[in-house]
């Protein structure tokens, strides 16, 4: 059974190595991920594909890619820290259960990052901008927030913060 699971993992690994583009936002990817029963393998594949997708996203939208990269690195760091510092009680009889819980938690966080990226990638439509204009819009909002200056008024439209002045500049 474990050998069979390892072979499934190797098939996904070979896709990664060949450099074939895998749509991690499509239902096929979700099915592939659900088929992987080994939690550590699932997490590793998810992290590798997220890193690749974040790098690709950064070619168009560096601000959003940086945000997602920071979220992913924080997830990975938390995962490693929790594994490293298992309490003695956790390291006893329940070590395997605790390790599985840690892996499951990290996988859920990585999947949330994936969902956030998907929502961000589609948000340009709700803003009425092109994909490239949305990237520029994100830069304007980021610089405004980073430098603490007021520019226009933010409104929440369908769960997305919209600033009409920044939006008109992005066009």
Q: For the regions a protein language model found, what residue spans apply to each?
A:
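Catalytic cores and motor modules of nucleic-acid processing enzymes
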Residues: 1-171
């Amino acid at each position: 059974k474990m050998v069979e699971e390892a072979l499934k993992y190797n098939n996904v690994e070979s896709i990664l190595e060949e450099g074939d583009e895998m749509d991690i936002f499509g239902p096929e990817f979700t099915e592939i991920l659900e088929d992987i029963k080994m939690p550590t393998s699932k997490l590793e594949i998810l992290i590798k594909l997220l890193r690749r997708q974040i790098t690709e996203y950064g070619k168009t939208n560096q601000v959003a890619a940086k945000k997602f990269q920071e979220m992913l690195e924080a997830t990975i760091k938390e995962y490693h820290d929790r594994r490293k510092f298992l309490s003695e009680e956790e390291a006893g009889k329940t070590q395997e259960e605790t390790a599985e819980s840690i892996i499951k938690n990290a996988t859920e966080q990585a999947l949330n990052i994936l969902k956030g990226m998907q929502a961000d990638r589609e948000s340009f439509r709700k803003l009425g901008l092109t994909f490239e204009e949305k990237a520029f819009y994100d830069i304007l909002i980021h610089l405004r927030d980073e430098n603490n200056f007021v520019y226009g008024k933010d409104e929440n439209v369908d769960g997305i913060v919209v600033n009409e002045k920044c939006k008109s500049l992005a066009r």
